[in-house]
Amino acid sequence: MDTPDDLYYTDDHEWLRVENGTATVGITDFAQSELGDIVFVELEPEGTKLGQDDIFGTVEAVKTVSELYMPVGGTITAINTELELSPEVVNEDPYGDGWMIEIELAAPDEAEELMGADAYAEVT
């Protein structure tokens, strides 16, 4: 499993990349592997304010539907619209083109409560 060192991780298998008060969120390589072929992604719209652990969307795979949880609180500033037509990108590139949302962080220090790559590798 791929677990980049520059990201934060949650127990629910979401990742967070923080840059200048904003963050990008997606699901981990482990999560996409466990889900199998992803066939549909539904995300909350831009402008939605959510708290840490709130649901920001769902992914539907051939064998299950899984809810997506906010790793930190914030306001959605962008969604990956490519996933509407090509949800399989999440399977192909979960840390790159398969990103899901970008957020403006409500409390940037919340990210420090999440796991680093080494701790996440122990969970998976």
UniProtKB/Swiss-Prot annotation:
Binds 1 lipoyl cofactor covalently. Pfam families: GCV_H (PF01597). The modification N6-lipoyllysine is found at residue 63. Residues 22-104 form the Lipoyl-binding domain. Its cofactor is (R)-lipoate. Keywords: Lipoyl. One of its GO terms (biological process) is glycine decarboxylation via glycine cleavage system. InterPro entries: 2-oxoA_DH_lipoyl-BS (IPR003016), Biotin_lipoyl (IPR000089), GCV_H (IPR002930), GCV_H/Fam206 (IPR033753), GCV_H_sub (IPR017453), Single_hybrid_motif (IPR011053). GO terms for cellular component: cytoplasm; glycine cleavage complex. The glycine cleavage system is composed of four proteins: P, T, L and H. The glycine cleavage system catalyzes the degradation of glycine. The H protein shuttles the methylamine group of glycine from the P protein to the T protein. Belongs to the GcvH family. This is Glycine cleavage system H protein. It comes from Salinibacter ruber (strain DSM 13855 / M31). The lineage of its organism: Bacteria, Pseudomonadati, Rhodothermota, Rhodothermia, Rhodothermales. The gene is gcvH.
